[in-house]
Structure formats: C-alpha cells, structure tokens
Amino acid sequence: MKLIIFTGLVLFAIVSLIEAQAENEKACLPQYQVCTDAPGNCCSDLVCDCYGRYKCGARIGRNCFCLQKGVIYKREN
C-alpha cells in the first residue's frame, strides 16, 4: 500500500515538473508583433511599447508592439 502511494506521489511530482517547464518555455513574441493583449510576452531583448490612436483629437484606440529597448521611433512626414 505504501509503495502505491509513494509511486503516485512521484508520478504527480514528475507531471508537475513537466508542466512547469512547459509554462516557462512559452514562445515569445518577435519584433514588431502586436502585444496589446500580452504585454509581458515579448522576447527578452524587446519591450512592449504602446501608442494611443487619435482621430480629430479623440482617442479611438491603442496599439502595442514588441520593439527594441531604448530605440525611439519618430514620425516622418
């Protein structure tokens, strides 16, 4: 009986470890991908930058993209 309980606990520990590893190895979002709904999923060398969208002075939405850290993007006319 003790062997069955011990075996069950060991199997449970192995399954938990496998699930934790899979969670840590989630695919990250590459550069220029939309991260509006997942701001923490950009790859390690990127940051999720968000910008407000305006039309006639009224805010109509928000866009977020995975961009390089420390890079400033300016609008060109």
Curated annotation (Swiss-Prot):
<keyword id="KW-0800">Toxin</keyword>
<dbReference type="GO" id="GO:0005576">
    <property type="term" value="C:extracellular region"/>
</dbReference>
<dbReference type="InterPro" id="IPR019553">
    <property type="entry name" value="Spider_toxin_CSTX_knottin"/>
</dbReference>
<keyword id="KW-0732">Signal</keyword>
<keyword id="KW-1015">Disulfide bond</keyword>
<keyword id="KW-0964">Secreted</keyword>
<comment type="similarity">
    <text>Belongs to the neurotoxin 19 (CSTX) family. 08 (U8-Lctx) subfamily.</text>
</comment>
<protein>
    <recommendedName>
        <fullName>U8-lycotoxin-Ls1a</fullName>
    </recommendedName>
</protein>
<dbReference type="Pfam" id="PF10530">
    <property type="entry name" value="Toxin_35"/>
</dbReference>
<feature type="propeptide">
    <location>
        <begin position="21"/>
        <end position="26"/>
    </location>
</feature>
<feature type="signal peptide">
    <location>
        <begin position="1"/>
        <end position="20"/>
    </location>
</feature>
<dbReference type="GO" id="GO:0090729">
    <property type="term" value="F:toxin activity"/>
</dbReference>
